[in-house]
């Protein structure tokens, strides 16, 4: 907590001079007790939020690294996918030639019989 002038202890330990016709010291003490409780609550909440912020920043760093690693991995995949697709196309072409080539030979042979 930067630029904080008072801590809860400072508020508790603060003593005011008493003058005639001044404020009721009991009322001031009760009010300061409430201020101290609120101040401590805000300090705890601030600390909790800072810890959560640190945790989330670490998580962002981890996820950013994972994305960076994932991007390098995906650039390598299309090359392997392209070679796999080319291999599949070659096999399909050979299979078609074999199947349809045999049918063409059968059709030619049948045609000669008629």
Swiss-Prot record:
Family statement: Belongs to the GpsB family.
Database matches in Pfam families: DivIVA
A GO CC annotation given for this chain: cytoplasm
Gene3D superfamilies per UniProt: 6.10.250.660
Principal localisation: cytoplasm
Matches recorded under NCBIfam families: DivI1A_domain (TIGR03544), PRK14127.1 (NF010725)
Subcellular location: Cytoplasm
Stretches of the chain forming a coiled coil according to its record: 32-69
Upper taxonomic lineage: Bacteria, Bacillati, Bacillota, Bacilli, Lactobacillales
GO process terms (BP): cell division; regulation of cell shape
InterPro entries the record matches: Cell_cycle_GpsB, DivIVA_domain, DivIVA_fam
Keywords tagged on the record: Cell cycle, Cell division, Cell shape, Coiled coil, Cytoplasm
Function: Divisome component that associates with the complex late in its assembly, after the Z-ring is formed, and is dependent on DivIC and PBP2B for its recruitment to the divisome. Together with EzrA, is a key component of the system that regulates PBP1 localization during cell cycle progression. Its main role could be the removal of PBP1 from the cell pole after pole maturation is completed. Also contributes to the recruitment of PBP1 to the division complex. Not essential for septum formation.
Listed name of the protein: Cell cycle protein GpsB
Species the sequence originates in: Ligilactobacillus salivarius (strain UCC118)
Subunit annotation: Forms polymers through the coiled coil domains. Interacts with PBP1, MreC and EzrA.
Keyword Nucleus included in the entry's annotation: no
């Amino acid at each position: 907590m930067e630029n904080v002038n008072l801590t809860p202890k400072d508020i508790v330990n603060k003593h005011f001079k008493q003058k005639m016709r001044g404020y009721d010291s009991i009322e001031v003490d009760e009010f300061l007790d409430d201020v101290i409780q609120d101040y401590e609550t805000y300090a705890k909440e601030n600390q909790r939020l800072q810890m959560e912020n640190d945790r989330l920043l670490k998580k962002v760093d981890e996820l950013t690294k994972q994305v960076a690693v994932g991007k390098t991995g995906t650039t390598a995949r299309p090359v392997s996918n392209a070679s796999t697709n080319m291999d599949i196309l070659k096999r399909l072409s050979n299979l078609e030639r074999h199947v349809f080539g045999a049918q063409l030979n059968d059709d030619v042979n049948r045609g000669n019989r008629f």
